[in-house]
Amino acid sequence: MNLPVAIDYPAALALRQMALVQDELPKYLLAPEVSALLHYVPDLHRKMLLATLWNTGARINEALALTRGDFSLAPPYPFVQLATLKQRTEKAARTAGRAPAGSQVHRLVPLSDHHYVSQLQMMVATLKIPLERRNKRTGRMEKVRIWEITDRTVRTWLSEAVEAAAADGVTFSVPVPPHTFRHSYAMHMLYAGIPLKVLQSLMGHKSISSTEVYTKVFALDVAARHRVQFQMPEADAVAMLKGNI
């Protein structure tokens, strides 16, 4: 079996089950589970949105804002530019009225999976998604979003995929709203050895504390793997205290 990141999948699955006990820890899917879920998304346009969430860690509103111009797919280092909408919203809330022009926070996320990049190129070519389109009301040219849908539609797509998987005997032990892909991306990158500060930048977290929540899952793993023993034969303990050992 060829896994995208060399991890002990049974151990990772057991760790995830242990983490599920704590409500404050993120709910995430492992790479084989994401690939299996995508198998049950028949439409390429739908599948590539979910694959984009998985390959970039984007928030759903960030992904739905993407246009063709936000992607640079040329080798050797394809990437996507995401507007970090959560930080932008927070900044706007602190100022009177709208945020000043040019204040939008962006982040670059490398697209390191060649299969994803090739599928994205195929989708754009097949659906003939334009860069711009004239607004019929204003007459102005505007950038065209790749996925002109709402997050509610995405949730419906996911529900349909989960139902199709269940009908085929495949189930998932965590809920699968759009944000699950963001958590899954973060955990997948940590499994791949990406440093925490780098992950913070890729995720668009303003504070490192937001990123550190993912390392709490690995804290469970480290503690469990050490197999620390607390008990010794009671007779030996008594003898030790008496000075006989």
Language-model segments: which ranges?
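Basic, Lys/Arg- and aromatic-enriched nucleic-acid-binding interface segment
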Residues: 31-60
